[in-house]
Amino acid sequence: MSAFTLYPAIDMRNGKCVRLVQGDYNKETIYGDSPYDMAELFEKEGAEWIHLVDLDGAKEGKRVNDRHVIEIAQKLNLKVEIGGGIRSENDVYEYLSAGVERVILGSSAVSNPPFVKKMLKQYGEKIAIGLDARNGFVSTEGWLETSTLKATELGKELANEGAEVFIFTDIATDGMLSGPNVKSTVELAKETGKSVIASGGVSSVADLEALARNEADGVSGAIIGKALYTNQFTLSEALERVKRK
């Protein structure tokens, strides 16, 4: 069994499963009324992990869809990682103590480094750093802001503070089904020497295989969203192929 992990994604907005194009809240497609039902479907297809995003939370800077997150973590046999709207120690504590496996800190890595460093010290690899980049520069606040900070620079800095897992999203490819940015993902893994999960742009099983070929360099998994919802391939197909690589 390959260690390369596939993370089916459920993006939640107003309690529903949605997809946005390049993080644009005006370009939303609803794919289901129940995040729990969707997660259960992925579990039946063989998922071990699920990647949840609280889009309302990312925009509002506080947890909004946490009820759905906790229900999935407690009732299904899935490891859950959650991002979006996690800004305080209490947010992190409540998710982890409710059975969530990993909490993703994104915007706060730029806006509140002391908080992120403290959480890394306290929880180690239960914390993933979400690095969302536009043209190589870190983007924050639900992708509404772009900073002057390079993703690789921030990655190296946080790796020195104890970050073990990064989730790298290239915003230009997200929701576009145009193929992931393999080059930038590998670059981040090499620069930090840590585990990097790729997010954004996966459109085919071949895309997943292209990422998985870089596992030795630290690319440890891929998040799949729109490709599953638009039936480009099934999760069970993808799991089977990546396992055989």
UniProtKB/Swiss-Prot annotation:
Stated name of the protein: 1-(5-phosphoribosyl)-5-[(5-phosphoribosylamino)methylideneamino] imidazole-4-carboxamide isomerase
Main location: cytoplasm
GO MF term list: 1-(5-phosphoribosyl)-5-[(5-phosphoribosylamino)methylideneamino]imidazole-4-carboxamide isomerase activity
CDD domains linked: HisA
Keywords on record: Amino-acid biosynthesis, Cytoplasm, Histidine biosynthesis, Isomerase
Subcellular location: Cytoplasm
Keyword Nucleotidyltransferase included in the entry's annotation: no
Gene Ontology CC entries for this record: cytoplasm
Top-level taxonomy: Bacteria, Bacillati, Bacillota, Bacilli, Bacillales
InterPro entries linked: Aldolase_TIM, His_biosynth, HisA_bact_arch, Isoase_HisA-like, Isoase_HisA-like_bact, RibuloseP-bd_barrel
GO biological process: L-histidine biosynthetic process
HAMAP family: HisA
Species per Swiss-Prot/TrEMBL record: Bacillus subtilis (strain 168)
